């Protein structure tokens, strides 16, 4: 949040608009859902790296610096191919579409991380590291560092960086990656070292005469990060069901991203951007009171997330899942309000009903809060549930 605030301050000083309130709330909320999913361990590991090391290791590198260097190279190489697969195959795109859904390019959009990565198969691409006996704990330490090193280059404020452009992934390289211009699309998959794109033919330099246009060719058209996470999957399911071609029912999942059977493409057309330079950013009308209310709700959801972290080891996993699910619903509701659709007025009542049900289930105690704090929090939930009914458009 500090770095995002610094980026916003510098942008304002330079007279550049890099953030929109609704877009930022959507991005930060997406990051929150990803964190909750991770701590609840809602994923299936196809094969673990620890198992690979224990069963196929043929040699053990002794020098620590060599181990760390090899691990970094393997992590980055694996990241390149996972990233490329996520872009190029229909079923895998659903795991990554949330990250590209913003029509802005800023530090907050880096937090748009997936909750739809149900199956984890990354270890399969790390077999060379397992053969050489690189310990699993090295990747456990290196993984978060490697991920954080991908945060800084999601910005429009940093120009090209001289000699570093030939070595590292820079903001310029990653602007290309997030762009939907014909010159840029499906380029620059590298995560730390740009060498992989140059080696495998997917590198594209940012051109001074081609300004990047950000987003996806099939626009998200919502601020709700949970809907965005599963929108592509829902489209695949519908197309697989609706097509009359039995082969297409199966192959749609493994075809290039965006491919649809001919019969459903004609019968059920979907919105696509044919000319990026004519892009009209998703921007439903949001009065100031909508925005203020959604920011308050975001911070309340953040407080609940931290409360869940504090409680995590002191309550049953069933209660952890229940609390996590409620926070997901909470995020779904306040982010939907920013879409300004007629249905948003009933969302507050749903939130109130779920809160009341959980409260009764826990004998009028909100996940370990004192009676007084439960009453205080419940009063806020009641008030915030009624606000959408009376809030003016």
Regions found by a protein language model. Give the residues of each.
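A membrane-cytosol interface segment of integral membrane proteins
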Residues: 211-259
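Membrane-interface helix-loop junction between the first two transmembrane segments
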Residues: 5-25
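Membrane interfacial helix-start motif at the N-side
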Residues: 32, 105-115, 274-294
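Juxtamembrane "helix exit" motif at the C-terminal ends of alpha-helical transmembrane segments
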Residues: 41-60, 124-139, 143, 300-319, ...
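Loop-to-helix transition at the N-terminal end of transmembrane alpha-helices
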Residues: 18-35, 317-325
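Substrate-recognition/cap regions that form aromatic- and gly/pro-loop-enriched pockets
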Residues: 283-369, 373-391
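Short, charged cytosolic
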Residues: 1-6, 16, 84-97, 251-275
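Membrane-embedded catalytic scaffold of the fatty acid hydroxylase/desaturase
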Residues: 29-41, 61-225
